[in-house]
């Protein structure tokens, strides 16, 4: 049990570090050092949270592999985007394969009114075509990982009967922020929260580019041309809604 709890922290740190680790310049810059510091803090928090006997913030601690899937999705997204973005610098067959994979996905997922197309429409006018291609490929890769995450979890719930095989589901341990004494029927509140999370998980990939466009109109141009900025923005844009969708499915279950 101790080893299982200990193993959660390194994945958090690795997912946050690898975007800079594959690019040596990041370690010589302030942003790179800040990412490492935040990764260490996040890893320490996850370790303390999982090792403690009583829950505080993290949900579904004792309903694996819910959180494990989320960590793996973030790690995989950051890794794929990093290798794809650094393809020319790495100049390896693996990097070339990821670059070709990104171009293939962009052709499949970039269609009218798709989230990927809306991301492109949110870019400032005059964005170079090469940069637009990079953003399109990154958005396609991140969105595919998010869809895969949702499908994988839905399969676990529908086919494997999650979380039934993990024993009795303790609401207090797995939903520490949910107050069953808050008033009203508990099942009705869980279904309401489930519906809200699923709707937000579906809509956010469409609404976020529009919100970004409004922010640009208010505060001026915002550049995402930096490799690390592009990687983390695309990761958050895709994985955060997927996490909300997962939470909605879990609450409905």
Task: Give residue spans per PLM region.
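Alpha-helical transmembrane segments and their helix-start/interface "positive-inside/aromatic belt" motifs
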Residues: 1, 60-77, 139-148, 188-198
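Loop-to-transmembrane boundary segments
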Residues: 1-9, 182-205
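N-terminal ordered "arm"
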Residues: 1-59
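Juxtamembrane "helix exit" motif at the C-terminal ends of alpha-helical transmembrane segments
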Residues: 23-25, 204-225
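Alpha-helical transmembrane segments
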Residues: 30-39, 137-158, 230-239
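Long, highly hydrophobic alpha-helical transmembrane signal-anchor segments
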Residues: 55, 64, 68-69, 86-150, ...
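Juxtamembrane inter-helical linkers in multi-pass membrane proteins
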Residues: 162-185
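Alpha-helical transmembrane segments and their immediate juxtamembrane interface regions
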Residues: 216-253
């Amino acid at each position: 049990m101790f080893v299982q709890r200990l193993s959660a922290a390194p994945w958090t740190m690795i997912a946050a570090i690898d975007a800079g680790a594959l690019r040596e310049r990041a370690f010589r810059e302030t942003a790179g050092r800040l990412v490492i510091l935040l990764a260490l803090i996040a890893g320490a928090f996850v370790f303390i949270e999982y090792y403690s006997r009583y829950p505080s913030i993290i949900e579904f601690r004792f309903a694996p592999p819910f959180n494990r899937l989320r960590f793996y999705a973030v790690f995989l997204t950051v890794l794929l985007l990093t290798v794809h973005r650094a393809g020319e610098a790495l100049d390896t067959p693996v990097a070339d394969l990821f670059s070709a994979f990104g171009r293939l996905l962009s052709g499949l997922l970039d269609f009218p009114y798709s989230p990927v197309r809306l991301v492109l429409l949110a870019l400032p006018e005059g964005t170079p075509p090469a940069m637009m291609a990079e953003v399109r490929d990154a958005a396609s890769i991140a969105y595919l990982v998010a869809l895969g995450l949702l499908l994988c979890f839905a399969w676990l719930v529908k086919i494997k009967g999650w979380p039934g095989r993990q024993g009795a589901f303790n609401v207090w341990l797995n939903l520490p922020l949910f107050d069953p004494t808050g008033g009203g029927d508990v099942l009705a509140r869980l279904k309401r929260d489930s519906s809200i999370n699923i709707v937000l998980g579906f809509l956010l990939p469409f609404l976020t580019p529009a919100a970004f466009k409004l922010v640009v109109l208010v505060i001026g141009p915002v550049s995402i041309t930096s490799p690390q900025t592009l990687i983390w923005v695309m990761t958050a844009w895709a994985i955060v809604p997927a996490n909300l969708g997962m939470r909605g499915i879990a609450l409905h279950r």
